[in-house]
């Protein structure tokens, strides 16, 4: 009944044109608003997917960190046990801390992340270089890969046409006795090799280099690390993987 009553006004003659026009305009506005809402939601969903993609580029599937403090001990037998797990595609050992990068007069604080040669296999960072190459070098001749924001802050040059910057990496030392503040910091040089551009949170704060260089500068023990980053095989149930890893590592 109500539908028939309303339809009369949509089909009205000239004497009721005002109602007819208002009805069609209202219908058009509602339709337009609905389309806009769908468009906004679609754009938002796409943006959410982009953000997740950017974060997954930098972060591994699983990251193991100590319950307390900044480091934990991981003996060779536990490393082998992790490597032998069926769901582990690969993993990288990490030595990480806050540092200061100095390039001549320019200085900038960063989070320095020492990684091993497996890092290329578990991270998307090497595929996000805007210039240079992904080369972490060795303990004695380390390479440095920095975020785009860090590059600008410290005026770091990686262009092969010019001499790449040699950057001083200033790090805290562990296990130092005495009250001399200078004895508690270390300085080492790393050659700038590449620049990554992912997202401001990472680009403005992170620098990657050789894990053995970082451990050497910070006086880490041979089996001491800050984290383990693990890439899981496709189809792995994350909760089950974490449970098995917990059984190996215990309460480190």
Question: Where are the predicted features?
Answer:
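Short acidic/glycine-enriched loop/turn elements at secondary-structure junctions
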Residues: 89, 98-191, 216-218
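Mechanotransmission and gating elements of multispan inner-membrane complexes involved in transport
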Residues: 172-252
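Charged, alpha-helix-enriched surfaces in structured cytosolic catalytic cores
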Residues: 1, 19, 42, 46, ...
């Amino acid at each position: 009944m109500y539908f028939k009553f309303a339809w009369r006004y949509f089909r009205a003659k000239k004497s009721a044109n005002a109602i007819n026009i208002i009805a069609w305009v209202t219908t058009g506005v509602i339709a337009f608003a609905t389309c806009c809402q769908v468009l906004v939601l679609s754009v938002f969903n796409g943006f959410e997917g982009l953000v997740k993609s950017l974060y997954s580029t930098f972060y591994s599937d699983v990251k193991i960190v100590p319950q307390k403090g900044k480091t934990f001990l991981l003996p060779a037998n536990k490393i082998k046990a992790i490597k032998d797990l069926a769901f582990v595609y690969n993993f990288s050992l990490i030595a990480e801390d806050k540092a200061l990068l100095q390039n001549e007069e320019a200085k900038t604080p960063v989070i320095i992340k020492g990684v091993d040669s497996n890092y290329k296999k578990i991270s998307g960072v090497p595929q996000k270089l805007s210039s240079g190459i992904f080369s972490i070098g060795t303990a004695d001749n380390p390479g440095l890969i920095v975020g785009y924001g860090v590059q600008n802050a410290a005026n770091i040059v990686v262009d092969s046409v010019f001499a790449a910057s040699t950057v001083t990496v200033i790090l805290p030392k562990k296990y130092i006795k005495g009250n001399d503040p200078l004895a508690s910091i270390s300085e080492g040089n790393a050659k700038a090799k590449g620049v990554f551009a992912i997202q401001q949170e990472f680009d403005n704060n992170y620098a990657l280099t050789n894990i053995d260089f970082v451990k050497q500068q910070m006086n880490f023990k041979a089996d001491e690390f800050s984290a383990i980053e693990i890439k899981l095989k496709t189809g792995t149930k994350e909760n089950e993987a974490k449970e098995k890893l917990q059984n190996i590592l215990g309460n480190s």
